[in-house]
């Protein structure tokens, strides 16, 4: 077969004409300095603030300080294999985490990667971690209750869907327990829960996950964990990752409860990063923008208006105080951002009042409008009664001869404290709460010995399940307070068969 010169030249010409150079241009830089989870990079002149950069071993970093001659990058992973002179390239992406139904029931790190040993997560959608909070006109006032199942909270400091309610107290006062109980009580409430563990021991997180699993709460919960052994950047971004996962559900019209446990450790991690990035320190060595650190996070909790589906994110941030000092920098910041606080006191905790909620210093600024009518009516005077009891209690220590009125007040106060006590991981449905608080405020418990109050409540709840179902259903379905006669007949009937202990 003869080869024609014309065919060869035509073939070469077409090849040359159709040739396309697939040259990719990547912006790269060089590591100048590395240590303590921070890298200084020379180059990367066009990098964006908050952009992800990739090191030679695949570890990602987050561009934080954009300076004239270098870029300060916080490293989101192990940095032992990164050394001076290594190449770093831009990714053109800002930080995103996987979101969606696939995340439910899983334990993930702040990057959305599974750490529970149950295989990969096949999420199809991602969302940027840093996002502007929902605007004013897209929101709606808080008007739906979020029941925690804890009598002292639902009666005295009620929480509404879309609210930010701070849980604050010293170490070992039951802050995490209050939050976990609130998650357990969302069973069958059509609420997705997200538990963000920041800077906690792995063993503690494991115990909490097991608690949720045993109660069947992991079926509607996502756990985001940045443990104490993780680098500071992961502790810093963990809450933002959690709320990003929650926003996906909120914008789809669902209700979300998110717990940040705790933001004190996040602030400490951010302080560490800022000092290593050589940003000027302020009060208590925190950087100047530590208020914005928490405000931009907590403002993302919202109740959307009906046009946007009416979804909500309710946030329960936790802050740990030192020796009850709520006037420190971070506690005062978060108190001013949130819509109220639940103050847990170690004195109460160690005297056996658990949950150790100090009713005088705890407040809910918007939850009152979300409280169901029945609870609002029966618990109306409860806070005042408790406050006057605490006052009288301190006076009663000095004198033994008390007048009848004072003695009655003290006796009612003792019973109030007993009724508001509650076991761990034992949330109580709101209709049962209304029942026992009605019995308390209307004087039905005045003749029951104080040591019998908890047993009375327990037996009364069991009795009501089978003998006062109509009453319970009416409270549950309408939210209104049934006729007092119905309560009277139920409580009186139960008291006939109740065995008081010998005083």
Curated annotation (Swiss-Prot):
Record-listed ATP binding positions: 169-176
Membrane topology: Peripheral membrane protein
Key words of the record: ATP synthesis, ATP-binding, Cell membrane, CF(1), Hydrogen ion transport, Ion transport, Membrane, Nucleotide-binding, Translocase, Transport
InterPro entries: ATP_synth_asu-like_sf, ATP_synth_asu_C, ATP_synth_asu_C_sf, ATP_synth_F1_a_nt-bd_dom, ATP_synth_F1_asu, ATPase_a/bsu_AS, ATPase_F1/V1/A1_a/bsu_N, ATPase_F1/V1/A1_a/bsu_N_sf
Source domain of life: Bacteria
Marked site positions, Required for activity: 362
Main location: membrane
Enzyme Commission code(s) on record: 7.1.2.2
Catalysed reactions, semicolon-separated: ATP + H2O + 4 H(+)(in) = ADP + phosphate + 5 H(+)(out)
Protein name: ATP synthase subunit alpha
Organism: Staphylococcus epidermidis (strain ATCC 35984 / DSM 28319 / BCRC 17069 / CCUG 31568 / BM 3577 / RP62A)
